[in-house]
């Protein structure tokens, strides 16, 4: 109630969770929220195994991650944008180095991880 349905899904989810928290329906510790994320991921894995309810369980994972972002005081929208920009940057680096279409996924993954390590060292 009171949360516009026209809001983007991440923001709508966060606002609904904030309203629930305002009346006491909330975890006290980050570890409890992380446990809920783990539980939802396990349910998604089960849904994938039986090829049923995948979309719903995926939504539950996203909802629980938005809740974790709220607990960590992270804006999920800007966090996702930042990760997307980071992915694009790393992918472009790989494209400069190799002909992606000629390598196996395993070879590309190795290069990806090398670039990731390089990026982490530069932080």
Q: Can you annotate each of these PLM segments?
A:
Residues 1-58, 62-123:
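Flexible "arm" and connector segments at domain edges
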């Amino acid at each position: 109630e009171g949360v516009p349905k026209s809001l983007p899904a991440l923001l709508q989810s966060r606002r609904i969770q904030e309203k629930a928290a305002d009346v006491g329906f909330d975890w006290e510790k980050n570890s409890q929220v992380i446990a809920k994320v783990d539980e939802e991921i396990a349910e998604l894995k089960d849904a994938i195994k039986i090829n049923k309810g995948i979309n719903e369980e995926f939504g539950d994972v996203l909802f629980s991650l938005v809740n974790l972002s709220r607990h960590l005081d992270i804006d999920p929208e800007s966090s996702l944008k930042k990760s997307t920009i980071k992915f694009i940057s790393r992918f472009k680096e790989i494209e400069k180095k190799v002909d992606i279409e000629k390598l196996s996924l395993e070879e590309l993954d190795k290069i990806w991880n090398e670039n990731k390590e390089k990026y982490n060292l530069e932080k």
